[in-house]
Amino acid sequence: MKKIIFATGNQDKMREIREILADIDAEVVSMKEAGIHADIVEDGSTFEENAVIKAKTICELTGEITLADDSGLEIDYLNKEPGIYSARYMGEDTSYHIKNASLIERLNGVPDEKRTARFVCAVAAAFPDGSVKTVRGTMEGRIGYEEKGENGFGYDPIFYLPEYGCTLSLIHISEPTRHAQIS
């Protein structure tokens, strides 16, 4: 059976990717499961560049097909912040409750039509022959005025989806379905 390495140490992401790739004929393993302990510097200027950096680094170390992702939140009014720094916005140890409160405060007084935002996810696949493929998906919405909902994670409680009339945290959908909606 073929092996695909998913370049993450995040067990929630591993669970999600295994659900998404359940129908392929390959064993999907994490870096830890593959015995890889690499501290990869994500110094790209786009989500795609960061995903490629991770995928190529691990593929070159192992000779195995490697998938990697980079994702985050872009808020148009804030010049697409926090963008590629979404996880590190206000510091990696800062809770998302505090990060969300900060973003809401920064948008204080900004009308609905200027609170447009999107979740972005870029995935890179690096192959042993040196080739790399990337794909980018987005989910459009707005930033709400307060946190709402307990489901999801990160910025989900402030990411308002007008077509559903609620935040992403209030929508009860499975993770693979959630990712499939990013197109």
Model-derived regions, located:
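Anionic-ligand binding patches
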Residues: 2-5, 11-170
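Single conserved hydrophobic/aromatic residue that forms the stacking wall/gate
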Residues: 171-183
